[in-house]
């Protein structure tokens, strides 16, 4: 069933496919603060209950997009005359929707990852070239002020030529566990966390370094989210899902769908339409993605990167250290210091605590002031939306196209291939035939930048820099 939408502003027209939680970032933007810049004219989903709920939420803001079943995707594009499609469906469906939209002559905005396998990367880029349209990947992490500032510092030459990066990301047992409940828990659906989650991180590294990876070797294992852990915690009587689990009250990684209005209305209330359970047991034997991963990368500009991702840490955050020939840049963020011990939902999160410190090779360290930001993902979501919908400048080149999306996903895809062969190195060129690289970055990433003079007065971020003392360890 569909009813042709009536645009509210005559602006660019958007259709949205895939109506899980993440879709509401875009739905609420186009029915709220960004509605003057774009009309939401179509909604599409495989679950009619989720579809009805999204229509209802839009109607509360007097926006009435047409509703379409997943099988009516092309009809939605024709009838709504959408200019662009926003793809927020499960990862394994991205390539299909992106290619179909491009063939229909539409631009595409897609959630990360671009897709989950190398063949689909090639397919998307070929379709984009043939169509002459544009694909944008929603890499919101680029937009957070702290990560943008890191890019500016590196580009300034403050630490000279970059030689190595250490990157550690910690997901806690609230956020991390969620990937083991949902469709992400199967490699064929998500590519595992090295694709679904780490595509953010590999994109940041690519963007910060102005390069792409040449070779990857990796190791992955399931160390925590497995039956043995549940047995060790005394959860011998665990069930298939949290809602019907005899061990629910004793499990510290349980999920109560009824405690969240959004989860209740989007998922629990609509299970009867497709049998999808949002709260499957995180310790189930059929899970085949890893919760502990490391990767060693060598980049085309000869930077070496060590990467570590764990999904069961006591707190959540990350630490990145850039080693350069003139010093180091360290960025450290605490997103959530701990998880409630009784398994209850986390309390409202405090603002992210982020520090950005430059340690010159000779001299005292200084801490940079990070511009304030509002909203999720370090303020990245709000800034990304303002740029995506066309009313904010992008002087730092944060917008990511399908090439950037492919080359970040390919790192995770190559890492998975390495793990499957016992850690053997995998050359990305063997996977990337036909996948163009993003536009190259200029100096300071070449050797000529290693010992050039750093003129602090040229860079606004130095105006509020504060010298600090760092104790030796």
Positions of predicted regions on the chain:
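Short Gly/Pro-enriched turn/cap motifs at secondary-structure boundaries
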Residues: 194-195, 283-287, 310-311
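Glycine-rich, N-terminal phosphate-binding loop of Rossmann-like dinucleotide-binding domains
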Residues: 88-89, 169
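Catalytic cores of eukaryotic secretory-pathway lumenal/extracellular enzymes that build
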Residues: 21, 49, 68, 95, ...
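Beta-strand-loop-alpha-helix segment that lines the small-molecule cofactor/substrate pocket
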Residues: 5, 79, 84, 90-91, ...
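N-terminal Rossmann-like dinucleotide-binding module
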Residues: 1-62
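C-terminal helical cap and adjacent loop that interface with cofactors, partners, or active-site loops
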Residues: 8, 25, 289-473
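Conserved SAM-binding strand-loop segment of SAM-dependent methyltransferases
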Residues: 65-72
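Predominantly a Rossmann-like dinucleotide-binding segment in NAD(P)-dependent oxidoreductases
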Residues: 20-23, 141-280, 422
């Amino acid at each position: 069933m569909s009813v042709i939408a009536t645009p509210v502003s005559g602006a660019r027209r958007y259709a949205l496919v895939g109506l899980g939680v993440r879709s509401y970032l875009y739905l609420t933007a186009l029915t709220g603060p960004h509605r003057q810049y774009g009309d939401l004219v179509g909604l599409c989903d495989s679950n009619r209950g989720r579809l009805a709920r999204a229509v209802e939420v839009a109607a509360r803001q007097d926006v009435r997009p047409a509703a379409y079943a997943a099988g009516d995707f092309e009809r939605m594009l024709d009838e709504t005359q959408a200019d662009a499609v926003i793809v927020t469906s499960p990862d394994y469906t991205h390539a299909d929707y992106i290619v179909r939209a491009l063939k229909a002559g539409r631009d595409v905005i897609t959630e990360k990852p671009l897709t989950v396998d190398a063949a689909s990367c090639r397919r998307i880029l070929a379709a984009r070239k043939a169509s002459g349209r544009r694909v944008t990947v929603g890499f919101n992490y680029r937009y957070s002020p702290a990560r943008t500032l890191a890019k500016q510092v590196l580009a300034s030459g403050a630490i000279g030529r970059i030689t190595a990066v250490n990157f550690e990301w910690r997901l806690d047992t609230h956020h991390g566990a969620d990937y083991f409940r949902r469709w992400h828990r199967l490699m064929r659906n998500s590519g595992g966390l090295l694709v679904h989650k780490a595509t953010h991180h590999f994109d940041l590294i690519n963007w910060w370094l102005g390069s792409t990876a040449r070779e990857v070797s990796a190791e992955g294992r399931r160390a925590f989210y497995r039956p043995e852990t549940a047995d060790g915690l005394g959860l011998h009587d665990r069930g298939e899902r949290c809602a019907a689990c005899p061990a629910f009250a004793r499990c510290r990684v349980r999920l109560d769908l009824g405690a969240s209005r959004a989860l209740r209305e989007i998922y629990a209330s609509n299970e009867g339409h497709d049998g999808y359970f949002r709260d499957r047991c995180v310790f189930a034997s059929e899970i085949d993605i890893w919760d502990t991963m490391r990767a060693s990368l060598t980049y085309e500009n000869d930077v070496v990167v060590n990467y570590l991702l764990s999904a069961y840490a006591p707190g959540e955050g990350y630490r990145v250290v850039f080693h350069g020939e003139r010093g180091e840049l360290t960025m450290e963020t605490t997103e959530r210091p701990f998880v409630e011990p009784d398994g209850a939902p986390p309390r409202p999160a405090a603002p992210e605590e982020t520090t950005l410190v430059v340690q010159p090779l000779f001299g005292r360290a200084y801490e940079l002031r990070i511009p304030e930001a509002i909203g999720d993902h370090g303020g990245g979501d709000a800034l990304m939306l303002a740029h995506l919908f066309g009313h904010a400048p992008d002087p730092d080149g944060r917008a990511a196209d399908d090439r950037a999306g492919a080359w970040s996903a390919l790192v995770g895809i190559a890492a998975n291939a390495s793990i499957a062969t016992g850690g053997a190195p995998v050359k990305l060129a063997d996977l990337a035939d036909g996948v163009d690289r993003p536009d190259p970055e200029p100096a300071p990433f070449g050797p000529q930048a290693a010992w050039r003079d750093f003129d602090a007065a040229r860079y606004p971020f130095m105006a509020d820099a504060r010298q600090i003392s760092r104790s030796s360890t």
